[in-house]
Regions:
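Exported/extracytosolic protein signature
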Residues: 1-299
């Protein structure tokens, strides 16, 4: 190219590259170009009697540059420069939801929780989900049985740790057991997603969903009036520097409620009302069960 002087005289060219599947969240994608130029179009420039100048870069020739650019470049021929541009891969996002907020939070009542993790297209390493079932000294209890099991949904995910899309491919789920309290951990590991050219379509939206149930723990520390809250933490590798990125979300606090009943029993002489009974009389008992004024839940 020949570029004349003047602000209006520029050359522009465009090229495209494809982001590789190995790209990780928050990884900075750098692209650097090196360029050189000459002081004249070539040797055939009539600046002397012969019509040709000396070899490019020589003392009697044109000044030029070299690519790749030497480091350091101490040569007089230093007509060279670089230009860089960069962009970053998107981070993960997550949300924690109580799918049944209207459920009365009494001892043993199951609440349905869901953690949704949205991943950028590419590869995510060391993906871990922790759910804190306990709060302020009281804890939900995880249910994992035929009636209330843990389930997973994998949307636009290709593999987990190179294997199938199921819990067996996770690095570890040792704490995700029936009756667990405190913190349960899904160590998912490495996930590879499906991918597409988002310039032309946006049908691929990688997502992992964990759905599970927990209930207020029936122990001596969980009682009427206690506040309970459930929170989740997601960690994963920063693709640029390898540090750990952390995401947090929690559900609304719920107050534990319990039924408190009072029972009264009365007896009367059905054979001779108002008279003390004797042998052969029929006694009638009336039992009355009602909520105490302090009761906060159906029984």
């Amino acid at each position: 190219y020949e570029i004349l002087t003047g602000a209006a005289n520029t050359r522009t060219f465009t090229f495209q590259v494809r982001v590789d599947t190995t790209a990780q969240p928050l990884e900075i994608l750098d692209n650097t170009i090196e360029a050189k130029w000459d002081s004249l179009p070539g040797q055939s420039t009539a600046l002397n009697a012969t019509g040709n100048i000396a070899a490019d870069g020589s003392a009697l020739g044109l000044r030029n540059g070299t690519v790749p650019i030497p480091s350091p470049n101490t040569d007089v021929n230093d007509y060279e420069t670089t230009a860089s541009a960069s962009t970053s891969v998107l981070p993960l996002t997550m949300s924690k939801t109580d799918l049944g907020p209207a459920v009365v939070n009494t001892i043993g009542a199951h609440r349905n929780f869901e953690v949704v993790i949205d991943l950028p297209e590419g590869t995510t390493n060391n993906l871990v989900v922790e759910d804190a079932l306990s709060f302020g000294g009281v804890s939900y209890m995880l249910s994992r049985n035929a009636s209330f099991d843990v389930s997973y949904t994998f949307e636009d995910i290709v593999s987990i740790n190179g294997g199938a899309l199921d819990e067996a491919s996770f690095t570890s789920v040792a704490t995700v057991v029936d009756g667990a309290t405190g913190t349960v951990t899904w160590n998912i590991g490495s996930g590879i997603t499906a991918e597409e050219d988002d310039l032309t379509q946006t049908n691929v939206n990688p997502r992992i969903i964990i759905n599970y149930h927990a209930r207020p723990n029936n122990d001596v520390t969980t009682n009427d009036g206690d506040n309970m809250q459930n929170s989740a933490t997601v960690t994963y590798d920063n693709g640029e520097d390898g540090t750990t990125e952390t995401l947090n979300d929690n559900t609304l606090a719920q107050t534990v409620v319990e039924p408190l009943l009072s029972i009264n029993k009365a007896v009367s002489n059905a054979s001779t009302p108002g008279v003390a009974p004797v042998a052969g009389d029929v006694l009638e008992y009336v039992i009355t069960i009602e909520h105490d004024a302090a009761s906060t839940s159906d029984a």
